[in-house]
Design a protein with these regions (language model features):
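A short coil-to-beta-strand element that immediately follows conserved catalytic motifs
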Residues: 67-76
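A generic structural micro-feature
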Residues: 12-14, 88-96, 116-121
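A structural signal for short, well-ordered beta-strand segments
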Residues: 20, 73, 98-102
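NUDIX/MutT-family hydrolases
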Residues: 101, 113-146
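Acidic, metal-coordinating catalytic segment for phosphate/diphosphate chemistry
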Residues: 1-19, 25, 89-90
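Conserved Nudix-box catalytic region and its N-terminal flanking loop in Nudix hydrolases
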Residues: 24-63
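Conserved hydrophobic "DFG−1" position in protein kinase catalytic cores
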Residues: 22-23, 30, 102, 126
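Active-site-adjacent beta-strand/loop module that shapes the phosphate/pyrophosphate-binding cleft
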Residues: 81-111
Length: 159
């Protein structure tokens, strides 16, 4: 099996991932877990040898139980931050993410729970873009309210 695109670099980590934008009735499908006090997009790391498109289709299926098609690439996000997970606590992480709008089937009924690579339980949650809940990426709130066909690039640097 191919390894995740997560590479140790000097004192930090390079992480290449994909995220899904799954919208229905003005809400976005997000993921939470037992350890985090925030929500994040459906998605995960690209595996070596996989394209970003292949990765998002696989990740959406793993987390929702539904095979979905890609609509279009929406955002590229570069993010420098310090890890908060026990495996990367305090390490500088440079994460490059590709966020894809997905074609949501009319009968879309995702599973409610999945598991992370370390067997932590994850849960799916439909969230209004106006909800005052902490979610990442932070630009989703504003950008998804005013969608365009243009691919946008964002940089967040917490160094």
């Amino acid at each position: 099996m191919n390894k995740d695109m997560c590479v140790a670099c000097d004192d930090g980590i390079l992480n290449i991932r994909v995220g899904a934008i799954i919208m229905k009735d003005g809400k976005i499908l997000m993921v939470g877990n037992e350890r985090a006090n925030y929500l994040y997009s459906v998605g995960g790391r690209i595996k070596f040898g996989e394209t970003a498109e292949e990765a998002i289709v696989r990740e959406v299926f793993e987390e929702t139980g539904v095979k979905m098609e890609i609509d279009r690439l929406g955002f590229v996000h570069e993010n420098y931050f310090y890890g908060d997970d026990p495996s990367n606590l305090g390490k500088l992480i440079y994460e490059i993410s590709f966020f894809f709008y997905m074609k949501v089937p009319s009968d879309f009924a995702p599973i409610n729970e999945s598991f992370t690579e370390d067997n932590s339980k994850e849960h799916l949650k439909w969230v209004s873009l106006d909800a005052s809940i902490k979610m990442y990426p932070e630009f989703f709130r504003a950008e998804l309210k005013n969608q365009t066909d243009t691919v946008k690039h964002f940089l967040k640097d917490e160094r």
